[in-house]
UniProtKB/Swiss-Prot annotation:
It is a multi-pass membrane protein. InterPro entries: UPF0324_pro (IPR018383). Belongs to the UPF0324 family. This is UPF0324 membrane protein SPy_1056/M5005_Spy0779. It is found in: Cell membrane. The keyword Transmembrane helix applies.
């Protein structure tokens, strides 16, 4: 059997799991399709007996379909629009990202958490949730159970943010503009940002959704420097002495991140020439669906019992990151006079 045909059963299995997960994600956006895909994959893995037939396809999906999803994610980014509208929130974005990464780095040893999981929780909390985890996992060569753990933690605090932040913003007396920046900088995933801003708009008859989404998209651009930095750090760590002979920037930097940037540039150029942003809608949707497929594959490769037993430290780290990001976002708004 050819290599491509050997991958087909695993690909089809991931596709079959992704379809109901996608539908469930549409019904319950506060949870999201990627989380449903991981859960379905982990549940099936408990009693699935045909791993030899599907192993190659599942592995291909969790790696290459995931990388393709990240590339297609770039078609949702108009760099001109993001930079024009998002510049006001840039100091807050930089502060919250730096805070989460420092917290994750500082607490990893204290919590006795593996480096990859701590990195994924920090990156996912600070940048763009599941998409950031998807982009970072191949760079640091994270295992599937580490990815599943990080996604689960991020989902938990996404849900809490969507439920609590509208009331918190009202209690603190945030303006509509202030809440848009707060939601865009302190909530992890795009779907949760949308849910949080929509809940605020329903309470206040406002339109914070557009502003929150653009702030969130500005955060997404941090994928580029963060993944580059992590890939260089990992490459240097794997070599005791970095010389021209044993270190190559081209080999260290993941190509799919370069294609992500290229996709963003294409979107920016085409929209500046008058092409409607809606023209890229199908590519953005395909990106989201590929992430769901990849999460199904990751779920299939994850031991649910082990995840439950070892997930406590990751949840604690996620909680500390979440609280730290929330406080820094609000403090920066106050200091900049936006609040």
């Amino acid at each position: 059997m050819s290599t491509h045909l050997r991958k087909l059963p695993g690909l089809l299995l991931c596709l079959l799991l992704a379809l109901p997960a996608w539908c469930l994600g549409r019904l319950f956006p506060i949870i999201g399709a990627p989380v449903f895909a991981i859960l379905l994959g982990m549940l099936l893995a408990l009693f699935y007996e045909h791993r030899d037939k599907t192993k190659e396809g599942i592995s291909f999906t969790s790696k290459y379909i995931l990388q393709t999803a990240v590339v297609l994610l770039g078609f949702g980014l108009n760099l001109t629009q993001v930079m024009a509208v998002g510049m006001q929130s840039l100091p807050i974005i930089i502060s919250t990202i730096a805070t989460a990464l420092l917290v994750a780095y500082g607490l990893q040893k204290w919590l006795r958490l593996d480096v990859n999981t701590a990195t994924l929780v920090g990156v996912g909390s600070s940048i763009c949730g599941g998409s950031a985890v998807a982009a970072t996992a191949p760079v640091i060569k994270a295992k599937d159970d580490e990815v599943a753990k990080a996604i689960s933690v991020i989902f938990l605090f996404n849900m809490l943010a969507a439920l609590l932040f509208p009331s918190l913003g009202q209690l603190l007396g945030l303006s509509n503009e202030g809440f848009a920046i707060f939601a865009g900088t302190a909530v992890n995933d795009t779907s949760s940002v949308t849910a949080t801003a929509t809940a605020w708009d329903a309470l206040h008859h406002s339109n914070t959704l557009d502003g929150a989404t653009i702030v969130k998209l500005t955060r997404t651009l941090a994928i580029l420097p963060i993944t580059l930095g992590l890939s260089l750090y990992r490459a240097k760590k794997e070599h005791d002495i970095v010389t021209e002979e044993n270190f190559s920037l081209r080999k260290s930097f993941p190509r799919f991140i370069l294609f992500f940037l290229l996709a963003s540039l294409i979107t920016t150029l085409m929209t500046s020439l008058g092409v409607s942003a809606d023209s890229f809608h199908y590519l953005k949707t395909l990106s989201k669906f590929f992430i769901v497929m990849a999460m199904a594959a990751i779920g299939l490769n994850t031991n649910l019992v082990k995840l439950i037993k070892t997930g406590g430290q990751a949840i604690l780290l996620g909680a500390i990151c979440w609280v730290a990001i929330t406080l820094v976002s609000l403090a920066m708004q106050l200091s900049l006079g936006i609040w």
